[in-house]
A protein has these predicted regions:
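Hydrophobic/aromatic-enriched cytosolic interaction surfaces used to assemble or bind macromolecules
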Residues: 1-159
Length: 159
């Protein structure tokens, strides 16, 4: 994971106003892993793992792990495979602004998350010669499982 993290950010052009630190928080079912790196020069400066404990909320444990991050640190949440589903469907024939809404209904019977709690994004797939219509990969997760954590991170000025 750390090598992938470093490779990604080594390809990202440096911005004049870039934050001095970037971080990722991996959300696994039984532990959390925080990786913090300096942006210039790119260098991993901290890797910390926290085993999840009964009695404390998931959000509290995440916040305890990122508590020492300076305000405005860019944090990327990485979901483990059990926290999302990926499905492939035909791309709806609607304007781009309406694709997310249309996809919600296209995948509602293909995912375990209730429609009113569905958070999703999609990726266009390259067209194949034997395909009759354009396809998309849809990534779906539970909004309620992430909303409180994201709100708390925003209160702590973590981006």
């Amino acid at each position: 994971m750390i090598r992938d993290f470093a490779k990604y950010f080594s390809r990202t052009p440096a911005k004049a106003n870039a934050a001095p630190l970037i971080a990722s928080l991996y959300l696994h079912p039984d532990h959390l892993k925080l990786v913090v790196a300096k942006t210039a020069p790119l260098q991993v400066i901290k890797v910390e793992t926290l085993l999840l404990q009964n009695g404390l909320s998931f959000t509290e444990q995440c916040l305890s792990l990122v508590a020492e991050l300076p305000a405005k640190t860019e944090l990327c949440l990485i979901l483990s495979a059990d926290r999302y589903q990926i499905v492939q469907v035909d791309k709806p024939a609607v304007p781009d602004a309406e694709i997310i809404s249309a996809l919600r209904f296209s995948i509602r019977e293909l995912v375990n998350t209730p429609l009113d709690d569905l958070l999703l994004d999609y990726m266009d797939l390259p067209e194949q010669a034997q395909q009759s219509s354009a396809k998309v990969q849809v990534v779906a997760t539970s909004l309620s499982s992430l909303k409180l954590l994201c709100e708390e991170l925003a209160e702590q000025k973590i981006k």
